[in-house]
Amino acid sequence: MFKKVNCLALMFGLGMTFVGLVACEDTTSASRPNDAPPVQIETTVVQDSNGNSYVRIDTIPSTLDTHKTIDPVTGDTFVVIDTLFIPADTTPHWVGNSALLITEISPVNLNWLDENGDDPGWIEIYNAGTEAANLKGYALVENLNKSRKWVFGDELIAAKSFRTVFCDKNNVVAVETTGEGEFHARTHTNWKLEKSGGSVYLIDPYYGIRDSVQYPELSAGLSWGIVDGGSWKYFATPTPEQPNNVSVAYDALAPKFNFNGNQGGFYTKEVTLNPPTVSDGLKVRCTQDGSAPTEKSPEFNSAIVISKNTVLRCAAYKQGLLTTEVVTNTYFIGETVNMPVVAVSVDPSFFTKYYKKTNGGEPDMKHDQMYAPNESYPEDPELPVHVEYFENGSKSTEKAWESEAGISLMGGWSRMERKKSVAIVMREEYGGGWLHYPLFETRKGVNDKYKGFNLRNNGNRFVADYFADAVGGAILEGSGVDYQRSRQVVVFYNGTYYGIHDMRERYNKNFVETNYGIDANSVNFIKHLNKTVTASNGTTADYLAMLAFINGNDMTVAENYEMAKSLIDIGNFADYMLAEMYIHNGDWPDNNVRAWKSPETPWKFMIYDLDHGFQWDWSVSGFSESTNMFKWVKQGGKNGCNSDNLCFAKLYNNLIKNDNFKRLFVNHASVMLGSYLNGANVTAKAKFLAGMLDASDVSRDMAVEAYMDRRGQYSHSFDPYGEKLGPWANERDDEFKSEIQSEFGLSGMGTVKIASNGKGVVLMEGMNLPGSTSSSTNYSGKFFTGGMMELTAVPVEGAVFAGWSDGVTEATRFVAVVDGLTLTANFK
């Protein structure tokens, strides 16, 4: 960075040589403190061979524009240096006296949307001057050690006008101000505001600090703004690009308080609660119906006796203070629950408006918003809730965790049941971030963080069992096919018992971050139902392009197949298709397809909604217990496929025409059947999930839900412990093997052993074989014989492949699959 100065040189003659001093004044006075001295430069004035005089600057080599003049009074000769550029001081220093002011900050924004519909934190700048100001060259930073970290481009702020800057690392330095409606196109910094508080600096091009603000920790939806007189205060309703006096300002936040003695939890007898100790003028007000307290709620100024299950929600109020925290405790009196407990506190309107009891029959889509979203009700409303979790049920001595969250109904026809499925989500607007807790046994200690979970009534299998749908996913643990982990819990709403629910992982962008460590915001996550594709994150463009290419091109052409392999995880796709087929899911492939991709990963498919698997064919047109799944996929499921490129089933129907994919599919089928898709594994996973149930809790739930009275309606007897799943799967083993053999003209199966010796692994058709570690393979299993198999030897870092046990030296090879085949890859 350089600054412009004007310099005056005073010379005195010494023969043909002139010696002088040059005094340079900074013409951009705002770029340095007022007491900074002029720049002194030593010079020598000399003449050239033509007698022309010029100034030689001895200490700063530079080419200068000058002209000579004579003082008319003294006769002294001067050389005026017209422009001299010298390096400016790059140390940020206070200048102030600026028309550009920082007037409001909101680190956790909820309502001021950017041009993408997102809600990043923002900073408001106000031009208090009488003329428009150009922000070009100004820096807006949170750290003076990086004072040019983010610099504005060419952007004007009109006189007496506001401008917000979004802080989200998107790095947009200049933008034409548009979108004055719901969305707002504005500049974006390359850094984020700190939720815990911090500082912000507006620095001019010459490193002068024009304004700065230190802001406190702010909870979701609040802002920190300046009011008349220069004081900074809290705002419950932010005022982006508006005067701050249009909203109520608060001097401080209401202080936190604690209940004296008894906290929420399980008690054998009634509990007496005494009012909390608070500072003068502070009043604690509470509700006991699940709703959030207000300034009009009853004051907690005398003892409260809790003699039955009660949720107590309290907040502190005082004139001039902003209340941001509600303390919630659920008290259980005389309850005995041996399973984990989820206690949900929610406004009673959730039940009167949405969580309605029905008597069955077809939903009234025109009048009841509780049913699946439709044209009249495009999405389920989400209400704020408080969730408390007791890991050991009534034996818990304290809450394992608690969190503010949101709740909404989910599911379709299963909403007709008394017990309904809901989604619990943690969002910034509720003050919640990631929940760090091992919710699911199979992920314990791996990456225990979640942005929410589902509480399912077991969907369409509501009258059949507790967890068959979950078993269908659990058998895939370790296979690389995504599924939603599960556990059984008991749910209470506002202290009222609602029975056993299936706590389930949520499928969305956050699932990918939890399970793969990939930034959630980089993920495309899609739902494919029939011929409709929607994205819950990212866009549908890549997915639709993938469908168009694979479904619209000849996959027997090698180049096309190679392109397909770059678009989807081909091994994952094969394993996913095999799992759906084995489970015999009739509500697929024209429904319930989920997939995701990221910059690092091609499209991966995810097992979802297996209610109509495991011999449950109720209400699926054209599907029965004897339906051949290959024929079902070829026809596109119950809705058919025809030649439409939006048909999901067509992906398989086209790819299977390629001999390489057919070979991969058959060999993957051998491994999947041997290690994951078999009766023994189904039985083991059913026992694992049944072990999460408690007999007394099951008896209570069954009595409340009256499953026994519903058996005749659906011709299914209730199977709480999943005892029917194993026997069904044992029969399915032989049945599905027969379907595969018939489909591909195979005659039998034989034992194949694949191993490594030294530090390296063997991939079978790109698959890490079960039991492999990061540096070794040792697998033995049954394979369909009569075809070929691709094997690839992969050394770990520092090792080299030294050949196969049969003398072959190529790392990648094809072998005939025969009974007794044994191959070892050697590494050294």
Language model regions located:
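Bacterial N-terminal signal peptides
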Residues: 9-20
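Solvent-exposed beta-edge/loop recognition patches
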Residues: 110-119, 146-231, 359-382, 386-388
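Bacterial Sec-dependent N-terminal signal peptides
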Residues: 18-51, 63, 73-76, 88-93
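A structural motif detector for short, solvent-exposed N-terminal "entry" segments of globular domains
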Residues: 87-144, 192-196, 213-217, 247-260
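Middle-to-C-terminal accessory/interaction subdomains
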Residues: 240-247, 340-345, 349-367, 374-377, ...
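Conserved ATP-binding subdomain of kinase catalytic cores across diverse folds
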Residues: 344, 362-534, 538
